[in-house]
C-alpha cells in the first residue's frame, strides 16, 4: 500500500510486506548506514497534522536529523483520518533513544498545536466579540434607549399633565358663581334687616320700644276711665311674671348688655356706632311719646313714682345723667340708664347700687305699702327699675298711674316740671314725703 505523501530522507525505502523494506534505486548511502539496520525497525504513531510541525514542510528537517542521530526515519501517511506511521532504522540503542525523543517531540508539538488552536480560538472569539460590539450593541442600545423614553415618558408628560391640570383648573373657578350668588343674597338679607329696622314694631312691643306710637283711643280710655284693682294688677304684671320681673331687675338691660357693650346690634352694624339702644332713643328724644304721654307725665303716680324719681329718665339720657332726681340724689348719682349702654358704660348699673340705697328703697316701699293695697305693692316691688321707667313713660304707666291716683289720692301731692318742648318731665316729691323717707 503506497503512502499518500512522501517525505524527504537520505535513503528512500519501499515497504514490501511485514517488516521487509528495500532501497529504491541506487542512492549514495551514508557511511554510518548498514543494510542490516533495515530489519526490525521501531514504529511510532502520531497525528498527521503533527508531522509538518515536527519535520517541517514535506519533511525538510528529516535528512538533518538522520545525519545527526545516525538513524533512518521513514514516514508513511495512509490517510487524513488515520494516524501517521514513523519508522526508525538503526542500531537498537539508537532506535530507543530516537523513539523517546520523537515521542517527546510529538507531545510538545501536540501541546504547541493546542496552544495555537486556543490562541486562534481566542483571537477568533475576540474578533467575533469585536465584530458583534461594532455591529450589534450599537443599534440595540440605540433602539432601546430611543424608543422607550420617547414612547413611554414623552407621551405621559405630553398627554397626562396637560388635560388633568387644565380640567382641574377649569372647574375650580366655579365657586366664584357661588360667591356672586351669595353676594346678592347677603345684600337681600341686609335690605330685609334695614326694612325690619325701619318698620314699626307691633303694639305688643310698646313696653320695650317707648318711641312707637300707641293707639290714641286706648290712651284716652286709660286716662279717663278708672281701672279696678284687679285690672291694675293685671296691667302691672302683664309685661312678665313676678319671677321674670325679679330676674330682669337683676340684669342691667332686657337684652344681653354684655354682648351689646362689646358687639354691635344685629340690625345695622354701621348705624349701631352712631345710634343708641335698638329702640332708637335719639328719635324718642326728639319725638313726643305716644298718645297723651305729656299729660300722663304730669299726672300723679303714687305707687311707682318713688322708683321713677330715683332713676334716670329713659327719654333724655344725656341730660338726666347730669341732673340728679330730687327723690334719690345718691342713687341717681350711682345708677345709670340701662337703655343706653355705651354712654352709661362708665356709670354704675341699677343692680350695682350700694346696699344703703337698696335698703332705703326697701324701707320706702314698706312706707308706701301702708297706704296702698297689698297687690299693688307686690306688683310695684316685682318690676325692675327698667320696666318702671318704661311704664312711667309708656302707655301702661298711664293706666297704672291714673288708676292708683284715683284710688288713693290722699297719699302725697307731687310737684312736676316739664321742659319747653315737652321732651322730659321732672317730678319732685313734697317736702313732707322726703322727710318721711328720711325718718324711715
UniProtKB/Swiss-Prot annotation:
Which GO-annotated molecular functions does the record name?
RNA binding; structural constituent of cytoplasmic lattice
Please tell me whether the keyword RNA-binding is annotated for this protein.
Answer: yes
Provide the residue span(s) of the region labelled Required for interaction with NUMA1 and regulation of apoptosis in response to DNA damage.
341-440
Q: Which domain of life is it from?
A: Eukaryota
Region ranges (Involved in RNA binding): 1-39
- Site: Not required for interaction with OOEP. Where? 151
The reported effect of residue 151 to A is: Reduces restart of stalled replication forks and cells show an increase in DNA double strand breaks. Decreases phosphorylation of ATR at 'S-428'. Reduces TRIM25 ubiquitination of BLM and subsequent localization to DNA replication forks
Stimuli inducing this protein: Induced by ultraviolet light, etoposide, doxorubicin, camptothecin and hydroxyl urea in embryonic stem cells. Induced by etoposide and hydroxy urea in neural stem cells.
Q: Which residues carry this modification: Phosphoserine?
A: 151, 349
What tissues express this gene product?
A: Detected in ovary, but not in testis or somatic tissues. In the ovary, expressed in growing oocytes.
Question: Which region ranges are annotated with the description Disordered?
Answer: 132-201
Translocase is among the record's keywords: no
Subunit annotation: Component of the subcortical maternal complex (SCMC), at least composed of NLRP5, KHDC3, OOEP, and TLE6. Within the complex, interacts with NLRP5, OOEP and TLE6. The SCMC may facilitate translocation of its components between the nuclear and cytoplasmic compartments. Forms a scaffold complex with OOEP/FLOPED, and interacts with BLM and TRIM25 at DNA replication forks. Interacts with PARP1; the interaction is increased following the formation of DNA double-strand breaks. Interacts (via C-terminus) with NUMA1.
Which family would the database say this protein is a member of? Belongs to the KHDC1 family.
Q: What is known of its domains?
A: Contains 1 atypical KH domain, which is still capable of binding RNA.
Q: Please identify the protein, giving its name as recorded.
A: KH domain-containing protein 3
The species is Mus musculus (Mouse)
